[in-house]
């Protein structure tokens, strides 16, 4: 029996802030946004500046389906946390303005009541933004959870969650579909020589591990308390967890294409099936 299609596409791979310069064009300057297609299901991870272009594409697809008399499936939008580089695209996500679409928004990093809804309202209000989420026309369901929960956003997709080591809390995800999996582990730090057991557990034997490679090991002592990790630590974790493929993510905004190419080459010398994430990169699982 043939497997159902499962693929990952990167719409933004930069961390901290967007970077639009001639020497970052190849890997792209948009911040965190990753699309996962599990058969007909669409799961989106993080709402950085890359979300805008993805949203435009999803609305075009929905219109084509409706023209054929078909109803688009609900979209699922997962947040790791709500630092600006992971939510800057939120007000500009075109599906929110399509009354024929429904979006489920998931988060597990905040505390208190109505966590996900509160995040939307606090971000989209004056003086930071002129209008609130009440302008959205789509159906919007807010889904709160605690890290450690296993979620079922679609009938045949499960999403495992863990808490990561980052300021203001952060969530890591493992998406399981049709006997395969992808782990999205960004915005986390590490203690040198002490692999994170939670990450090793959730990434065990995964088909693809996406990991926070903001820094190099040589840079890390200067930035150890910034809440980010290194691409080399990602290699060590991928090897220890038995991951089949590895993708470096959350690149420094100042990291040039030339520097990223060098990192990618060095990474492949240690872990053959690896990439540095770039906008437009599609990985079939």
Q: In which residue ranges do the predicted regions lie?
A:
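Active-site flanking residues adjacent to catalytic metal/cofactor-binding acidic residues
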Residues: 45, 80, 185-186, 211-212, ...
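Cap/insert and terminal regions of metallo-dependent hydrolase folds
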Residues: 190-279
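Binuclear metal-dependent hydrolase catalytic cores
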Residues: 1-183, 194, 199, 261-285
């Amino acid at each position: 029996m043939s497997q159902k299609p499962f693929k990952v596409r990167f719409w933004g791979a930069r961390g901290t802030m967007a970077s639009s310069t001639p020497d970052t064009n190849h890997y792209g300057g948009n911040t965190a946004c990753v699309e996962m297609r599990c058969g007909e299901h669409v799961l989106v991870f993080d709402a950085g500046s890359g979300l805008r272009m993805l949203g435009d594409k999803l609305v075009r697809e929905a219109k084509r389906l409706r023209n054929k008399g078909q109803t688009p499936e609900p979209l699922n939008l997962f947040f790791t946390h709500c630092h600006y580089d992971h939510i800057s695209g939120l007000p500009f996500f075109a599906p929110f303005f399509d009354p024929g679409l429904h979006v489920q928004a998931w988060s597990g990093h905040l505390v208190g009541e109505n966590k996900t809804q509160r995040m939307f309202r606090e971000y989209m209000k004056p003086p930071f933004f002129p209008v609130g989420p009440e302008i959205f026309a789509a159906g919007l369901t807010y889904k709160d959870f605690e890290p450690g929960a296993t979620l079922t956003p679609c009938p045949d997709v499960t999403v495992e969650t863990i808490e990561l080591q980052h300021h203001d809390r952060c969530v890591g995800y493992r998406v399981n579909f049709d006997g395969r999996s992808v782990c999205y582990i960004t915005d986390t730090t590490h203690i040198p020589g002490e692999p994170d057991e939670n990450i090793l557990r959730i990434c065990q034997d995964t088909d693809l591990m996406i990991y926070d490679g903001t820094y190099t090991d040589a840079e890390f002592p200067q930035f150890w308390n910034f809440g980010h990790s290194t691409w080399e630590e990602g290699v060590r974790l991928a090897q220890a967890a038995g991951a089949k493929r590895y993708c470096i993510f959350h690149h420094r905004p100042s990291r040039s294409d030339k520097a990223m190419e060098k990192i990618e080459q060095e990474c492949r010398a240690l872990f053959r099936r690896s990439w540095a994430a770039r906008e437009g990169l599609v990985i079939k699982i």
